[in-house]
Amino acid sequence: MIESIRINLILLLAFFICTSCIVPESTHVNPTFHLLTKTIFDQSGTGIGLSVLPENNKTALSQPFYLRQIELPYYLQENRIVSRPDEAKIEFRENDRWGEPLQEGLGRVLGLNLSQFLNSPFYSVYPQRKKIGTPYEINITILRFEKVSQSEVLIEASWEIFNMEFKNGSYPSQNGKLNRLVEITPTDRGPVTTKDEIKSLSDSLGLLSELVSDSVISSSH
C-alpha cells in the first residue's frame, strides 16, 4: 500500500514537472522599423535650376549652411509612428516604429534635400558642429507630421533663415510657414501600406526643403 502511494506521488510529481516545462506560444510581433528618405531630383542636378535664377540670387548657391536642431512637439518624439485622425486624438502604433530618433531623421533628410536644392555639398546638421565661415543658419520647427486619414498625411512647419554675414545676423532675415496635405499613393495597386505612408511623409519634406531653399536664396540679397 505504501509502495503504491509512493509510486503515485512520483508519477504525479513527474507530471507537474513535465507540464511546467511547456512554454505557451508567444503572441509577440516584432516591430517594423522605418526610415525617412531624401527627395530624388532630376539628373540635371539641383531642384532649383541655375539658369532660371536671377543673377543677384545665385550668391546663396554652393555656400555652406548649418541646420539647427529640429524642434518637435513632445508627442512626435516617440519612436512609435503616430496617426492623428482628428485634432484631439493621437494613435501610437506598437508594430511600426522609427528606426532612428525622428528629430535626427528629419534633420538628416532635410539636410540632404537642402544640399541638393542649393547645390551645397558642404553643410552641417545638428548635432554636428557648425563649420567655420558658414553664412547661413536654418531653424525649422515641425508642428504636425503624421497620417491624418487613410489617404493623406499632413505636414505643418515653420522656418527662419539667419544670414550671419549681415550685422543683424542674430535675427532671422527670412521666415515662412507650410501647412500641406500630401496624398498617400499605393505603390502596388493595393491598399495603402505603412511603407506608402512613410514615402508620402518623405515627399512632404521635399516640399518643405524647396520652400526653405527659396528663403535662403532670398536672404542673400
Regions from the language model: what does each represent?
Residues 23-41, 48-49, 61, 117-171, ...:
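Surface-exposed short loop/turn segments
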Residues 111, 115-119, 213-221:
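Sec-exported extracytoplasmic/periplasmic mature domains
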Residues 90-97, 166-208:
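Short secondary-structure boundary motifs at beta->alpha junctions and helix caps
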Residues 20-99, 103, 218-221:
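A structural "domain/chain start" motif
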Residues 8-19:
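Bacterial N-terminal signal peptides
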Residues 103, 107, 111, 202-205, ...:
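Extracytoplasmic/secreted envelope proteins and their assembly/folding machinery
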